[in-house]
Design a protein with these regions (language model features):
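A conserved beta-strand/loop capping segment in the N-terminal third of enzymes
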Residues: 63, 67-117
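Predominantly flavin-linked oxidoreductase catalytic cores and closely associated redox partners
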Residues: 121-262
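Beta1/beta-strand and adjacent pyrophosphate-binding region of the FAD-binding site
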Residues: 9-25
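Glycine-rich FAD pyrophosphate-binding loop
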Residues: 31-54
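Conserved Rossmann-like nucleotide-cofactor binding loop
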Residues: 25, 48, 171
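C-terminal helical "tail/cap" subdomain of flavin- and related membrane-associated enzymes
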Residues: 323-416
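FAD/FMN-dependent oxidoreductases across multiple families
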Residues: 78, 240-324, 330-332
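Conserved N-terminal glycine-rich FAD pyrophosphate-binding loop of Rossmann-like flavoproteins
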Residues: 47-67
Length: 416
């Protein structure tokens, strides 16, 4: 790697892999690559810590990858482990689903803290993370390397690498620069989120999911944080029937519903303003690579179309992209390796989620599904909770290539 003018400068850098975007998918890729001796540079237009509109929930799948990457939950001040899940059916009935106790199977981690901790982990591994550096364009693409222009302090700098991993979000500037954007694309989900404090009801310690009839197949949530705070929000599918402009009214109404007020307590206080974000969830249609560029996370539209959750998919896709580069070969071979890995690990789960989403789109389907699980006994409830939080891939029963000896018997992440 060439010397630079400062630790936060990209001036004339040369590296093996440039990662555009320092979110979970980008840092996961960087950590995997660095562990095999690859020189990696990560750029991000933001300065950390920075907030990210998100529900902050971590599934078992996400926790397992974080554990494998050597991430320490203690570096996130408000990390909250959840031991069970509470679901409310459209009929109003509530059910508790216990998670296994050996290890962590669900956790809440504010993204402003989680993403910053991941960046610091990368730096502790001698990965150069350049903040305030924004991708501008692809300057040159040859048979040996790719060169991009980066903007920092109103100056254009260049970075040359063998590959670029674009972890730069749903509206990926890298994808756009390659002429691969989809005009007018607004994602498959849309979500609202806000923090609340002075929560004195049961929500201050429960992970709650409300299946509201008017939100199906979407849902509302309240995820607990320390000091009587929660992350509360809702997500809906973009089905052409809902006007996103009306979501603010839905939000106001949701916070006044008796069961929500009861869960939060009478004196809860909403913090700052609400934030909203679109969620891409069609990984089976996404182009995962072009030339010497691989797309990961939201840039690969890799979120769960059933829940809108994306941190686990982001971490997984970043790791898969890194593994494809490590395996080596010509750019077309690397792209194909990554595309096949994404297909193996994400396509079947995506299609399963689509089918389930259709069932949950109607009150009768949601009520019936929850009723069946509620009558399945402790074993059924516990394993449903593990399945819901992706302890195993959602469609693993139908994808024999992913079967393993410890299927459904894996130890929990962060098991002391």
């Amino acid at each position: 790697m060439l010397q630079t003018k400062s630790n936060n400068s990209a001036a004339d850098l040369v590296c093996d892999v440039l990662v555009v975007g320092a979110g979970p998918s980008g840092i996961a890729a960087a950590l995997e690559l660095q562990s095999t001796g690859q020189t990696v540079v990560v750029i991000d237009k933001a300065f950390f810590p920075r907030d990210k509109c998100c529900g902050d929930g971590l599934t078992t799948g996400a926790l397992r990858i974080l554990d494998e990457l050597g991430f320490d939950p203690q570096t996130v001040p408000n990390w909250t482990v959840c031991s069970d899940v509470w679901l409310r059916s459209p009929s109003g009935s509530e059910m508790q689903f216990a998670l296994p106790t050996k290890g962590q199977f669900a956790a809440i981690a504010p993204r402003i803290e989680l993403d910053n901790a991941l960046v610091q982990l990368a730096r502790s591994k001698d990965i150069r993370v350049l903040e305030g550096h924004e991708f501008v364009s692809v300057r040159e693409l040859t048979s040996n390397h790719i060169t991009i222009d980066v903007s920092s302090n109103n100056k254009i700098e260049t970075v040359q690498s063998k590959f670029v991993i674009a972890s730069d979000g749903m509206w990926s500037p890298v994808r756009k620069s390659l002429g691969m954007s989809t005009p007018g694309y607004l994602g498959e989900w849309h979500a609202f989120r806000q923090y609340a404090n002075n929560v004195t009801g049961v929500a201050n310690e429960r992970l709650i999911v409300w299946f509201e009839k008017d939100l199906l197949p979407g849902y509302a949530w309240s995820f607990p944080l320390p000091n009587n705070r929660v992350n509360i929000g809702f997500g809906v599918v973009r089905d052409g029937k809902r006007r996103i402009q009306d979501m603010k009214d839905v939000w106001t109404d949701l916070l006044q519903r008796p069961h929500v007020v009861e869960a939060l307590g009478p004196d809860f206080v909403m913090e700052d303003r609400h934030t909203a974000w679109p969620i891409p969830a069609r990984v089976d249609e996404a182009v995962t690579g072009s030339g010497r560029v691989l797309f990961v996370g939201d840039a690969a539209m890799a979120t769960d179309t059933l829940t809108g959750e994306g941190i686990g998919q982001a971490l997984l896709s970043g790791s898969l992209a890194a593994e494809a580069i490590i395996q080596g070969g010509l750019p077309v071979e690397v792209r194909n390796t990554y595309a096949q890995a994404v297909k193996l690990h994400l396509f079947a789960d995506h299609r399963m989620s689509l089918r389930l989403s259709k069932i949950l789109a109607h009150g009768r389907g949601a009520r019936g599904a929850i009723a069946i699980v509620s009558k399945s006994g402790n074993w059924g409830k516990r394993n449903f909770a593990r399945w819901m939080f992706e302890d195993e891939p959602r469609a693993i029963a139908f994808t024999p290539k992913r079967w393993h000896r410890k299927m459904f018997r894996l130890k929990g992440p962060y098991q002391s």
